[in-house]
Structure formats: C-alpha cells, structure tokens
C-alpha cells in the first residue's frame, strides 16, 4: 500500500509540475469541451479469476490548460470529470476444465477524475499534433450491480454446496465492493486535429489501479482486486476565450 501511495503521489506532482514549471515560451490558453468513448476493464484478482473484458462507456467534461511551448513540446495539463463503467465479466470453467453455461458479470459505476500532463508535438493553430498523456486518476464508486445467469452450476466441497469453478474461487459472489475510492496511474497517447472550429482529439489510454475494490487484509479472501483498464476516447475542445484560427 505504501509503495502504491508513493507511485500515485509521484504522478500527481509530475502533472502539477508541468503546469507551474514554466521555462519556455509561455502560453495561457484554456480549452473546454466534451469527451466520450469506451472502456475495457478487468479486475486483477489474487487469487486469479478467469475473465473477459467488461465493456462499458466512459464520458464527461474536459478542461485543458496550455502553459508553455518548450523546445517544440506543447505543455499542458488536462483534467476531466467522467462517468465510467468498470467491473468484470467472468470466463467460467468448471473444476474439470469444462466450459459452463453459467454467466456472471459485475458492473461498477464510477465518477472518474484523471489529472494528466499533456506533452504534444506538432501544430498549435491548425493541423495535426501528436501527444502523450500521463498522471494520476481518482474515482469514486456510486453503485455496483451483480448480474448472473439463471443456470448456476454447483458441486459439493467438504459437505458444502458452492459454485463449481476451476480454482474454487467463489468469494466474489454476492460480495459488495468495500472500497469505493479508487486511485491509480493513467497514461496514453493520441492525435489532435485543430481547425477554425475547435480541436478534434482521439486517444488511447491504459489505467493501472493501485487500490483494491475489496479489503485485502490477511483474513480477507482476496489479496488484490484492482482495476485494470484500456480506454479509447474521442474529445472535442473549444478555446476560451475563443479566437479565430
């Protein structure tokens, strides 16, 4: 936990430093707009649970402050407030390694706030620019929903009837999330096309959660239960105050 906190704090201070450490040609430009995309999420469980990606939406508001251009790099900080659906979807196999008709998925709805440094290379006013994103991400779970099939294969283990699963991990069933606050590090790359009517942006991101959705003490069933996410996002931004390009 201490190591995870150090990593998160490093990402936060890296993003803030990009905002205030101005040593190049200064800029002072706000850009505001909307974003939307798709999230592919798994939960990294220990012990492991076989999974497919849980596909869900991610969408919200974006604010970007461009602070300087330094040796050709366009430096900015980007903050978003998003609705994000995470969770997991199980690939269910029996203790005999047979694929079962059972289905199970968990949907977790978050308010997500990434705070990212943006380093771009390319055109500022009109044309294309490539960029890198990196920084911390905070999220808060609003609700979680459990969906399971009517077919639910069970067997007897030590006189107890429980779901038939390949490695016997069943503690997640019926267990509500215990840690609503989620934090971690997000990074990605993208491309931006700037026109006279705004910025059109596409980016791909990877999020590595440093917190767990379930408690992880020695007495708890899971030592780890962290979000692990791929995201593809589309964003439209308009400069404020607006100026004709």
Predicted regions and their residues:
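Extracellular loop and loop/strand-boundary signature of outer-membrane beta-barrel proteins
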Residues: 44-50, 98-105, 172-176, 217-224
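Outer-membrane beta-barrel transmembrane domain signature
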Residues: 118-201, 205-217
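Residues that define the transmembrane beta-barrel architecture of outer-membrane proteins
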Residues: 28-30, 53-57, 107-113, 128, ...
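Outer-membrane beta-barrel translocator domains and adjoining extracellular loop/strand segments
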Residues: 44-49, 89-96, 144-153, 213-219
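Short loop/turn motifs that connect adjacent beta-strands in outer-membrane beta-barrel proteins
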Residues: 22-29, 68-75, 122-129, 194-199, ...
């Amino acid at each position: 936990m201490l190591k995870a906190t150090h990593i998160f704090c490093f990402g936060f201070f890296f993003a803030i430093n990009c905002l205030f450490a101005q040593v190049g040609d200064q800029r002072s430009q706000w850009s505001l707009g909307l974003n939307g995309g798709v999230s592919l999420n798994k939960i990294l469980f220990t012990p492991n649970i076989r999974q497919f990606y849980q596909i869900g939406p991610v969408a919200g508001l974006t604010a970007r402050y461009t602070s300087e251009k330094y040796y050709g790099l366009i430096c900015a900080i980007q903050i978003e407030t998003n609705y994000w659906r995470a969770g997991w979807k199980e690939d269910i196999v029996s203790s005999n390694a047979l694929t079962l008709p059972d289905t199970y998925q968990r949907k977790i709805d978050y308010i997500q706030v990434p705070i990212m440094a943006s380093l771009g290379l390319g055109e500022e006013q009109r044309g294309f620019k490539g960029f890198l994103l990196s920084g911390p991400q905070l999220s808060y779970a609003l609700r979680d929903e459990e969906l399971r099939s009517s077919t639910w294969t069970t067997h007897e283990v030590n006189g107890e009837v429980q779901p038939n699963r390949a490695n016997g991990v069943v503690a997640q069933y019926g267990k509500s999330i215990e840690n609503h606050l989620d934090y971690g590090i997000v990074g990605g790359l993208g491309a931006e096309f700037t026109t006279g009517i705004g910025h059109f942006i596409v980016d791909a991101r990877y999020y590595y959660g440093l917190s767990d959705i379930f408690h992880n003490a020695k007495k708890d069933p899971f030592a780890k239960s962290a979000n692990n996410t791929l995201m593809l996002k589309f964003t439209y931004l308009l400069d404020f105050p607006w100026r004709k390009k």
